[in-house]
Amino acid sequence: MTKSTMVRDLAADQTITGYFLVHEKEVRNTSSGKPYLRMELGDSSGTVEARMWDQFEAAKDVHRDDFVKVSARVEIYRNKPQLSLLQFRMAKPEEINLADFLPHTAYDVEVLFKEVLGHAEGMKNPWLKKLVLQVLSDPQIVGRYKRAPAAKVMHHAYLGGLLEHVAGLCGLAKQIATHYPELDVDLLLTAAMLHDVGKLDELCYERAVSYTTEGQLLGHIVIELETVSRAMDEIEGFPANLKTVVQHILISHHGQYEFGSPKLPMIREALVFHYLDDMDSKLAAVRAALASDSGEPEWSAYSGALGRKFLRLEEFLKEKEPPKETK
């Protein structure tokens, strides 16, 4: 069945009936102590908060990653659409088309992966080349590497987003190494290809993007440090000092302690890679905000990832009338 009501199309004062994926569900209490149901619902176009104030006993059988059919009133709360649920039920399997609920990259993942492998094959450092090709040929990794999102919310938060992010970083690494020839481009490429490999185990993404228990307890930096260290140990003769450098770039790529890195970047390439990663991530979040139909003609909707809204520059600079020619 084709889904007709999408999150991106929700507008104030609508009464809607539609199918959504449950991202979160919890029972909270109002300030007066009265319980109410709060859910985060979503589809491939985005997520929306939903609340039900009375008679939500049926919710006890609803869990994260379930599909539900809801009837609701669309309200605006803090400048964002919110659903006031009237009723809901579990959706039937034949009512659901998974493609409506899984946002995915606009690029062909096989083309992206071939592009990344091309960067790996062109590396001059034999140890780093062997390392990345070994990791990217691991049957336990390669399929998930092509499918995984890069994050739950912050950036490239859709299927294939991780690979899209990696391919973009590889291109940026080569460009910046051309401008700054003192940089070791193979180290930057290694970081680009392996810096988020821990997200394959940090995130689950069969229906909605969420965190695994391992992801919540360890985080992707710890997971990928173990994965990549194990791969280096399996390569006979891998230089110990080079192993330390790779490990440092991986654990420092978030750039600051408060963002999850246990060490600040203390190698030139580690610092550069942190900024490349941060720039690509933030621009992806800006792109997503500007691409959304919500917001105003000249302004995007508020971006939770970046804590602001963005000016639609082309619309702002558009000439309302062409300038008159002067004689």
Which residue stretches match the model-derived regions?
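Acidic, carboxylate-rich catalytic segments that either coordinate divalent cations
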Residues: 269-327
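Divalent metal-coordination and catalytic microenvironments
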Residues: 20, 65, 169, 250, ...
